[in-house]
């Protein structure tokens, strides 16, 4: 089974296409990077950057086949602006998954660590 793993972010969003068969391996991966447009209003810039993320993820959907998307769950910190930006990236991921008919599972970082290392 092949899955698409996503690490949501606004300035950079990591992705990896993983073959989870008996011999697990990474088939492809990369980082989607966006840069702020200092000349645009903040809301216009965020919309533009969401568009960049959407275009890049949609290209992954076009080029690869996978059973589902596994993405890091949204967490909330004391940094409202950063949290809002990650939430916008999450919205893009959710919308594209729905449009492409691909289920999404959310994984908490501490759960992934526990499964891989056995410690909390």
What residue spans do the PLM features occupy?
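Phosphate- and other anionic-substrate recognition elements at nucleic-acid/protein interfaces
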Residues: 1-120
